[in-house]
Amino acid sequence: MAVVVAAWARHAIWWQVYPLGFLGAEPESAPVSAPRPRLRTLAAWIDYLVELGANGLALGPVFSSGTHGYDTVDHFTIDPRLGTEEDLDTLIAACHDRGVRVSLDGVFNHVGRGFPAFVEVVEQGPASPRAAWFHLDIDQPGPDGFGYRQFEGHPGLVELNHDNPEVADHVARVMSYWCDRGVDAWRLDAAYAVAPTFWKAVLPRVRERHPDVWVFGEMIHGDYAGYVRESGLDAVTQYEVWKAIWSSLNDRNLFELAHALGRHADLLATFLPLTFVGNHDTTRLASQLTDPRHVAPALAVLFTVPGVPTVYYGDERGMRGVKEERAGGDDAIRPAYPSDPAGLDAPAPIYDLHRQLIGVRRRNAWINDATVAEPDVVRNEVIAYRVTDASHTLAVVLNTGDETAELRLPTADGRVAAGDGTAAAGGDGGLDVTVAAHSYLIVT
């Protein structure tokens, strides 16, 4: 059975921002007595995201932390490098005035070493009243006199004990507190590392007061649909389609994309995934693709498959950046932006392409009630797939080859909605289409 979510979320298109980078914050936390009112300045970008075609602002970490935002020290206060709680209130109000929803990044799998409960454990030892909030190893020697479970081997990221009811109480309070202040949605960082039963206990308490909140979890590998069913989340991130898009285009092996779209179609019976071609953890699309001509086909997939699309800031302008596995290796993909849109260079064609494809998506709002049919054509360099419901069809053709592709689609008629090619009714009821080399075609 499909997860039932708020109607607004089914038609959301997010513009994702990593605030500490976007707003040019210091690499490490600032004194609490000197908050920098940066968050409220994001209001200058609301018109920009609306003009792009988005209706949601997805914020990366904003809570008090030591460094990059994922080492939280206080879930109830805004990082002084970004401002105060009132600054976030101002931003949320400005977004809501324009019909824009706001999502926060909830880091609840782990905390920073400066998190008060962990500081107590360091100071008082395993006898601390909140020692059970963590996975401690009192027999393991170390600078603290004991060992503790670290997230993915990072000493600065202390894993929480999700079997402890007090941890569930804390997370439910945090989520409810910020929803009370107007937050519409949550991204759950590293959800894949948390047992789904934890969220099954937490989320009903949040939804009791906020039934329309939309909650999606970060999942990379694993059983996406199973996790959604067992956890009560509304959605998870669709990394399978993300990887298949750029990998199949680079390799000119569109069988990989066909396989991923088939798995994606299976997920739609359970939930509507969060789709993307880039985020704060990945090499940017413009750098990931080996042929810049394939940016357009990649975006065509993003905005035509059922899902909740997200555009990572800068991708709409063709920004480049490579993620590196080292300290500071995310800096290139999380850069500062100007204080307002007037500071940007003139829009590149990719910006207009985003707007055009988002326009196609908006004019075909039925897509999120549809499914992806088995591709009509799959070759190494060409794929043709249809998105269909009971009364609509949208056909998409990608051509990564060096020559114009000619093929017949099993649909009676249609007009070109976007792309570089032609469509004409064939003699036997099919549709004859041509698609230029290294391009795409969308027919509705």
Where in the sequence are the language-model features?
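Substrate-binding/active-site clefts of carbohydrate-active enzymes
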Residues: 3-14, 18-55, 62-181, 199-202, ...
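Loop/helix patches that line or flank the sugar-binding groove of alpha-linked glycan CAZymes
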Residues: 7-10, 25, 29-34, 258-262, ...
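Hydrophobic faces of well-ordered beta-strands that scaffold small-molecule active sites
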Residues: 13-16, 57-59, 102-104, 186, ...
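A structural motif
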Residues: 54, 183-184, 233-234, 307-308
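Active-site-proximal helices and loops of the catalytic beta/alpha 8
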Residues: 92-98, 119-123, 173-176, 189-269, ...
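Tight coil/turn sites that cap or link beta-strands
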Residues: 154, 419, 436-440
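Solvent-exposed beta-hairpin/edge-strand motifs
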Residues: 410-422
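C-terminal beta-strand-rich structural cap/linker in extracellular carbohydrate-active enzymes
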Residues: 427-444
